[in-house]
């Protein structure tokens, strides 16, 4: 049963390499307030390996999560009995970490007789803009992270239609792989952005993948390969070579992304009418160059551009708590038997077009 009363929800996030917990208030008018938001990044643990090691991540979640939840509750000035619900990210993500967070959420819910909300990590990103702004449905979401690159029509809580997706590398994944091949430290995305700012984007004629296609899908694998080929040709690389390669790669990725979003917004209008906004979410949305490109896309499309603060674009507990609060307001709770999921489609009824059946577009 739906309720219009205010709620206090604890959110737990452990799907990748951030161990996070937060408490969020959802008021009866639908507005939100963050009471606490504690995030521990495991970057230093994974940096020697050049990427996230699932076993290390899961063990760190086990070691850290209880203390982080305690800090989140203390900062919010609440006890567990004050909570209206406990929201835990139940996927998609690295299954070891997902199990840690969801099991902890279940334990709290069971001991304190509090409703459990098993949150789709992607839905949490999709709904985060409504935590920080008075945003009404429907809106067009560009979700870009290390594991996902999607254009999604957000029609309501639990109601999502994917308009476009990557058929190979996610955008964050491509940025990280380019950084690694150029010898830049982990995490690679911010390093590529920093190097690109000092580079000449016009030095290399990199391809613009999928440009001009009628569908709104993405592909970055070929662009990544083009960067690798140029880097091999120039080896050994001088610092300016690295800067120029990063600038050329980022410019090509942004031009392709802008084109894909123009198409995605057109498809959105044809199917659902005008969106209330173009919204960006996910860790890649913290990139300032990407933010600028998206702002121009929204301007050209005649719609407003909205994006959460950078701290709410990357993985955090507040987004999980908020998604839980949004679902709780509609009376949507979950059984303690809910199973963790390594893969969990945001749009569960999607049918992958035949030409993309053997690509990552199906996930």
Swiss-Prot record:
Binding site for Fe cation: 121, 125, 315
Alphabetized PROSITE patterns for the sequence: GLYCOPROTEASE
UniProt: substrate binding residues: 143-147, 176, 189, 287
Record localization: Cytoplasm
Highest taxon, organism lineage: Bacteria
Cofactor: Fe(2+)
Keyword hit for Acyltransferase: yes
Annotated cofactor note: Binds 1 Fe(2+) ion per subunit.
Gene Ontology MF terms in the entry: iron ion binding; N(6)-L-threonylcarbamoyladenine synthase activity
EC number from the UniProt entry: 2.3.1.234
GO cellular component, one term: cytoplasm
Keywords for this protein: Acyltransferase, Cytoplasm, Iron, Metal-binding, Transferase, tRNA processing
Catalyses which reaction(s): L-threonylcarbamoyladenylate + adenosine(37) in tRNA = N(6)-L-threonylcarbamoyladenosine(37) in tRNA + AMP + H(+)
Top-level EC class as recorded in UniProt: transferase
A single GO BP: tRNA threonylcarbamoyladenosine modification
InterPro entries (UniProt xref): ATPase_NBD, Gcp-like_dom, KAE1/TsaD, Peptidase_M22_CS, TsaD
Keyword Kinase: no
HAMAP family attached to this UniProt entry: TsaD
Family: Belongs to the KAE1 / TsaD family.
Described purpose of this protein according to its UniProt entry: Required for the formation of a threonylcarbamoyl group on adenosine at position 37 (t(6)A37) in tRNAs that read codons beginning with adenine. Is involved in the transfer of the threonylcarbamoyl moiety of threonylcarbamoyl-AMP (TC-AMP) to the N6 group of A37, together with TsaE and TsaB. TsaD likely plays a direct catalytic role in this reaction.
Protein name stated in the entry: tRNA N6-adenosine threonylcarbamoyltransferase
